[in-house]
Amino acid sequence: MTDTPAKAAQWKQQYNIPDRNIYDYKTFDQLIDNPAIDIVYVVLPNALHAEYVVRAAQAGKHVICEKPLATSVADARRMVAACQKAGKQFSVGYRLHFEPHNQEMMRLGQREAFGPVQHLSANNGFRLSTPSWRVDRALSGGGPLMDMGIYCVQGCLYTKGQVPVSVTAKFIPNPDPKLFKDVEAGIDWQFQFADGATADCRTRYTENMEGRLRAGGPKGWAELMPAFGYGGLAGKTSQNDDRLNLPNINQQAAQMDDFAACILHNRPTRVPGEMGLRDMQLLEAIYRAAETGQKVSTKDVLQLIDRTSAAK
């Protein structure tokens, strides 16, 4: 799917794609007449996710949507409802749920390998110095929280194995009001969990961060650094064992292979659209906490956790 003829010609040759399977945005809805296409993967600027997920579902296709699911909780609900109405599977592009290091963090945390997780910390960000759609709120819906911070949200939840009950947050001072006139330059937040555990997180468009995820309990800790990239992931534990000495893989290939298997074998995806809705609820709560300076309850957030790795 592209409006750029040069790209269409390149991909046609590179991947041996038949002409009938090449579309542009004007012909998108004609997908309904093409049984050769089973899945649509929506990888557009955030504000366009809702429209194209709904249209893909209406065309009778299963859908994967990149993160964040949408730019509002209302749109996220609409997307989930559209896929349910169409009877099609709906998944979020949460590739790290299929990545060995992060899967092991899920297992260690949820199985309480170091006792109940009492504290988590996570950071993720990069230095953005030139204008792009990422700092245009009309397209992005927000700044680094929507882009890089969502990995911290995800990591803390799937490692702790719980959805937080409240959040506090604050925006960092804006170092470049011209560049960051529409979105935050950075934000810090803390999740509070029902058992007293906390998760301290940071995300930035002003700093190349290490992309770290750490979880500690009374008997030790586990850490990934880097935790969220497409390769080079590495981890360690307080016991200096080899539990996080794991291979790096093609994460998105694993993610897409799993979704194909879900469709072929009629089983649910471990990262359903509802998980993206959950995360939009949390992102909105973080923004509300930062804007008001008040602790915001998240007790009404969808209670959904990926327990696949911990169950193995």
Question: Whereabouts are the PLM-identified features?
Answer:
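Beta-loop-alpha module in the N-terminal Rossmann-like domain of NAD(P)-dependent dehydrogenases
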Residues: 20-82
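Predominantly a Rossmann-like dinucleotide-binding segment in NAD(P)-dependent oxidoreductases
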Residues: 96-180, 293
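C-terminal helix-rich "cap/oligomerization" subdomain common to oxidoreductases
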Residues: 39, 244, 261-312
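NAD(P)-binding Rossmann-fold cofactor-contacting core
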Residues: 1-15
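Rossmann-fold dehydrogenase core element
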Residues: 76-95, 115-122
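Hydrophobic residues in well-ordered beta-strands that form the structural core
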Residues: 24, 65, 90-92, 201, ...
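Active-site loop of classical SDR/Rossmann-like NAD(P)-dependent oxidoreductases
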Residues: 3-7, 245-256
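Contiguous beta-strand/loop segments that form the cofactor/metal-binding neighborhood of enzyme cores
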Residues: 154-231, 253-267, 284, 301-312
